Amino acid sequence: MANILKTIIENDKGEIRRLEKMADKVFKYEDQMAALTDDQLKAKTVEFKERYQNGESLDSLLYEAFAVVREGAKRVLGLFPYKVQVMGGIVLHHGDVPEMRTGEGKTLTATMPVYLNALSGKGVHVVTVNEYLSERDATEMGELYSWLGLSVGINLATKSPMEKKEAYECDITYSTNSEIGFDYLRDNMVVRAENMVQRPLNYALVDEVDSILIDEARTPLIVSGANAVETSQLYHMADHYVKSLNKDDYIIDVQSKTIGLSDSGIDRAESYFKLENLYDIENVALTHFIDNALRANYIMLLDIDYVVSEEQEILIVDQFTGRTMEGRRYSDGLHQAIEAKEGVPIQDETKTSASITYQNLFRMYKKLSGMTGTGKTEEEEFREIYNIRVIPIPTNRPVQRIDHSDLLYASIESKFKAVVEDVKARYQKGQPVLVGTVAVETSDYISKKLVAAGVPHEVLNAKNHYREAQIIMNAGQRGAVTIATNMAGRGTDIKLGEGVRELGGLCVIGTERHESRRIDNQLRGRSGRQGDPGESQFYLSLEDDLMKRFGSERLKGIFERLNMSEEAIESRMLTRQVEAAQKRVEGNNYDTRKQVLQYDDVMREQREIIYAQRYDVITADRDLAPEIQAMIKRTIERVVDGHARAKQDEKLEAILNFAKYNLLPEDSITMEDLSGLSDKAIKEELFQRALKVYDSQVSKLRDEEAVKEFQKVLILRVVDNKWTDHIDALDQLRNAVGLRGYAQNNPVVEYQAEGFRMFNDMIGSIEFDVTRLMMKAQIHEQERPQAERHISTTATRNIAAHQASMPEDLDLNQIGRNELCPCGSGKKFKNCHGKRQ
């Protein structure tokens, strides 16, 4: 282990030396750029773009381009990037993460690689965690980019598609991570190419990269529509039942935060819902509602995991930033269960139309980089998942902050008493204090204690984040006391007021350790910026979540033996033990994210295939007849092959039914037309007849443009409907394969294999529906804007007809489960009439 650490440290040192040499080359252009007039300096952008178009690489332009940005920043912003900032910029250009301490000027550092990569004309996305930071950085740094001749756009959720498209067309686009994801999903749901807003994803520079790519990695972005099934009554019933339980009726695993019914709880459920066996197959839906009600009532905590807004809505609290996540809802019915718990209106369940996780969204960029002050602890995950290195950049000035050892108390009460006393003492001498909490509830509790102690203060949490910038701006002033929930990702520096340096700078007090060392380091990093003095102190208790989960029992015995109910234990060993516990949690979380990615990669591969084919259809300026006719041919082949093992009469009747109800006019084909033909001849006969029907259908359309429009809308509508159903089916499969681990099967391998089979089934189903709609649609000539309405189809009654068309004397027991159903539906037997068996 020691050798591994030594190798890592040596590699970092070697990388720093290499970066210093590259930065020195940038500095060699300093005098040359300073000698240029404003117009000459601005003209460099045009020169660089031409050189790039003529074959020069961005790497070869780096030294001059960085020097131009440095000089431009000095003239426009009054800021001149330091050597360490240039080094950070080089790391960003190479698609890695520079770890730069708070206050080291990451925003200015980003200007150099952003400018350089924007020269390609392919677009640069600067990604932030919230719209406030997007607007702030775009306004401040946009002044420099515009002066240098580059266009800057801001992509906000409130903008229209046209405004979004304009923002994405700019050389540099500022946006939040979620908005880029939703725009990507929405682009892959439009019917016309002109309605797409994004260009191909080129280069992303992610601010607070660890927050987005690690903390929110598993967060799925979901575009959904309303579900037709009304379920609010079931949520209320499950909630009422769960609230009636005693502690013995359920089992909570504190470490994994999971919950389930005990034997007595199962008995009570069967009595409450009047069931013989709760876990009978027909009660699967009910157990899902009960599981969500259990989680909502006993795992999800008000003012920690979520808050109830004044509008009676459940708002999720981001566990890493303390902000509420507007518009974000828990999936799979958990949000509705919480609404039932809190007695607020239950919103309709939704059905997922499209989804993607941040992991897979950002892996789609040609080049990805990001900035953070605390990324080294997650280096393995950055490297394994995103192929990104984390390179620590030296500070411009030595760090003077004093990090005290943790103080451990026996109880939460004694801990908070000590926190209030410490804050009061520092307030009285004028030293500003930032108190970091992990929950809204804790910040409110400390606030009440400080009011009682006569200490004026500000509170920053999910309930009042709109005043965030103003509160943080004043947090470094003399005598300021600020309580903040999870300072991670706040993005605003705390600058020291007059006379504060002499008082020891800003003191950061942590009221408990977070699961992640990185979040603790981010809180600490708010103090001691740019060589300022500062202090940090963490207060812990044996009743804290982290301590309860990892080994507080042994320490509890020490407190009891020494009779130290009000006193604290302080030692470096304790701090190391806490960090070891955090490492275990981080390891567990990483393993979970890695497993999620393995599942999500199945969806990613399938999504990329569907979206690529969808894009080809949308952007096609050609007659799609070859594609549609190929679908018709494959559908005919599937149906004929699917009945190859049936008796001749039964086979012909099933094929005839398929042809009548899905392919040809009902009275245009008889049994005699197919009798005596081989399977190959039947396929050819049906296909040739289908081509004539196809030509007849197309001839009803006004002109070539109407034909193209009709073809596109037809294919896209079918693909979108089938893809939505497929996403739902994959979600259900994912929940089901977990149980296969008990049969010594690898759930991920099972999911991959079954998911692949389901995808192939979906493709067959898409081609079947396109065939049926194309051949059976009642086409009326209309004006072009009504093109989407051309598909006035008899499909509904066709479905009823072919479902009723099963030959009466057919022995269903002779049909294989994976063969096509003889009724002609195009579905496998197990998913059609076989299901009813």
Swiss-Prot record:
The keyword Chloroplast does not apply. It is found in: Cell membrane; Cytoplasm. Keywords: ATP-binding, Cell membrane, Cytoplasm, Membrane, Metal-binding, Nucleotide-binding, Protein transport, Translocase, Translocation, Transport, Zinc. Zn(2+) binds at C821, C823, C832, H833. Monomer and homodimer. Part of the essential Sec protein translocation apparatus which comprises SecA, SecYEG and auxiliary proteins SecDF. Other proteins may also be involved. May bind 1 zinc ion per subunit. ATP binds at Q85, G103, E104, G105, K106, T107, D493. This is Protein translocase subunit SecA.
